[in-house]
Amino acid sequence: AAPADPRVLTGHPARTPRRHTLAVPDPVSGIRSSVAVWEYTPVPVAAPGSPGAPEGDAAAAPLVFVHGFRGDHHGLALLADALPEHPIHSIELPGFGASEPFPHAEHTVAHHADAVAAVIAALGLPAAPVLVAHSYGTTVAAELVAREPSRWGRLVLLNPIAEPALQASASLTSRVLAAVAEGYYEVAARLPERPARLLLGAPPVVWVTTLAMTRTRDRDVLAYTHDQHRRHFSGFASARMLSEAYRASSTGSVADVAARLTLPVLLVTLAALAVRLSVG
């Protein structure tokens, strides 16, 4: 069973975010749809100047979170818990979680980046924020930051997509799994919505997907991941929208815009090894 108290995993009490709903324009038609943004207000952990208190830019830096494929704000909730002193806005991409899908635009990396840009503009954050993204969200975040690097303080990419899943340099196993997944989402998109959702959200499929995606021997972490996927992995607008987003996640990568990321970038890999890069 998943730990009842997330402090078992983070060492910090859970933070409860407040939901905001912002209207963003469709990148094609301009028609507005709602995007959910979850705000975590900072919790002081130490008095300024005392041991353990954050210093310099870290003390004030607002964070913006962007989740991964088939995710929502819950996917980065433990990270928010572990960073209590930071104000955080966790954005649910159009079509995922509580956010509406685009009325007309395809759900691509560029269009999702457009939506995040519109949300950031509406929030009017007071300082250059740090953008933190996971998995598919890393391609969206990299695309956005590459357009205007000076707008951002830093970029943090958690388990970034370094190359397209079907690229020849990937392992044969990776390419086969990616091809199977692509077919799975394409088939679901062609079904009526009810059977498509039954296929996409089938418990055995979600369970196997979790095992394939998870690299840990920690039973608490594995149980928590299974529980989160069971609860939130089917929070998407439609099978068609999900197929579009999967296509975007499997054909794009952070490498597409790496040369334009002229700001400090932190990469965190599956092995939990962090490498700080100052690019440019």
Map each language-model feature to its residues.
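Flexible "cap/lid" loop of the alpha/beta hydrolase fold
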Residues: 146, 152-194
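Conserved HGGG/HGGXW glycine-rich cap/lid loop of the alpha/beta-hydrolase fold
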Residues: 36-100
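Conserved alpha/beta-hydrolase catalytic His-Asp/Glu region
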Residues: 166, 193-260
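Gly/Ala-rich beta-loop-alpha elbow adjacent to hydrolase catalytic centers
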Residues: 132-137, 141
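The conserved beta1-alpha1 loop
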Residues: 64-68, 134, 269-270
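Short beta-strand/loop motif that positions the catalytic acidic residue
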Residues: 261, 267-270
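Conserved acidic catalytic loop of the alpha/beta-hydrolase fold
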Residues: 110-128
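An N-terminal hydrophobic leader/cap segment in hydrolases
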Residues: 1-26
